[in-house]
């Protein structure tokens, strides 16, 4: 559900019904303009085994008119020393941080992050949160999909909870808790999603 919504917003998939607008643009008729203004990090990204971090960043930067300073982004995300390394040689956490850097290279107005801290340890997750909070405070809009409620509480001003592909809640974290019979967002999420009492592998 979450990734499909993201793909519809970006014009990769057509929705069954309704209309979509991002930054005042239609993702199906104005994809080029949207491409220049957004950055995307999908949950699963695959690249050539032998391509290096530097080559991948250079290739990505070449697609945009005014790309961000990717060496600085790599430094901030703690992987600048991997510049000459093949992407296939990176650990899962390093690869995930690289994918976030690639999403930020367009110097976007909106960045889409799909399960951005999957595979990161606790320390690395918090470092990524800190950087994203700084970017958010500078005016970057972050569209985040996540199963980690601690991450949602730290990074999100507004949240949308999906149940079987349908939005069942939209509002702030405090509103979600207030409208549920629980005091924690994780419990409120399970209640809205109809997963109370079920085993959820993502928690």
Per-region residue spans from a language model:
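ABC ATPase "signature
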Residues: 170-171
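Conserved ABC ATPase signature
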Residues: 86-90
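Conserved ABC ATPase "signature" region
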Residues: 58, 62, 67-82
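Helix-to-loop junction immediately C-terminal to a conserved catalytic motif
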Residues: 10
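Catalytic Walker B motif of ABC-type/P-loop ATPase nucleotide-binding domains
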Residues: 111-114
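Conserved ABC transporter NBD signature motif
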Residues: 18-26, 33-34
């Amino acid at each position: 559900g979450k990734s499909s919504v993201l793909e519809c917003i970006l014009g990769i998939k057509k929705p069954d019904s309704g209309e979509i607008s991002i930054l005042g643009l239609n993702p199906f008729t104005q994809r080029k303009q949207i491409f220049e203004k957004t950055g995307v990090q999908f949950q699963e990204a695959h690249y050539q085994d032998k391509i290096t971090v530097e080559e991948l960043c250079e290739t990505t930067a070449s697609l945009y008119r005014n790309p961000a300073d990717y060496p600085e982004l790599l430094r901030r995300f703690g992987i600048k020393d991997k510049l000459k390394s093949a992407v296939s040689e990176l650990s899962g956490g390093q690869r995930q941080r690289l994918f976030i850097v690639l999403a930020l290279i367009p110097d976007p107005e909106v960045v889409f992050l799909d399960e951005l801290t999957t595979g990161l340890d606790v320390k690395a997750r918090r470092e990524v949160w800190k950087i994203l909070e700084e970017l958010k405070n500078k005016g970057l809009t972050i569209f985040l999909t996540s199963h980690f409620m601690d991450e949602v509480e730290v990074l999100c001003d507004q949240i949308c909870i999906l149940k079987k592909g349908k939005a069942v809640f939209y509002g702030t974290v405090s509103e979600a808790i207030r409208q549920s019979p629980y005091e924690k967002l994780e419990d409120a999420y399970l209640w809205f999603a109809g997963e109370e009492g079920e085993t959820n592998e993502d928690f």
